[in-house]
Amino acid sequence: MSGGATGGPFKSAPIARPAALPPPLAAAAERRWQRYAGAAAEAGVPPATDGALKRVLWRVFACSDYVAESCARDPVMLQTLLDGRTLLRACLPDEARRRVTAAAARAQDEATLMRDLRRLRRREWVRIAWRDAAGWANAEETMAELSAFADAFIGAAAERLEAWQHASLGTPRSPAG
């Protein structure tokens, strides 16, 4: 894995420098960090050690149980987001559509489609929530990305399922043919 866990892209990231966390948030961040660090160690993924990255990670973990829990469940996902630098920029609607369509196209059956789309959705929701909690995206950008991905997920799933239905049952016709 590349420099994500040691800071790599975060040396130039727009680092939010919040005041010290209030004690309840600091305690939550500590618990969430410990859970993530343990899961990362089990997965063989080095946890964040770079100071700038760790400060941001603590802020995000303090603000979002969803992000912290997702990262603890899948530390490789966080490493992929860090290595790919996708946390550093917004995703345009066309890019969201391409990512989701590509994931849907790889699926060979409905169960795989649903699993792969859930996995991608979690990754993208974590990315979007991270950017929001870190102060790297404003509310308008966050809502636009959530909407673009929601539209893309619904559209890609419907298109793929419809294509499978057409292939197995034929194209629906009116009673007149």
Q: Where does each model-flagged region fall?
A:
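Non-catalytic regulatory/linker segments of enzymes
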Residues: 1-177
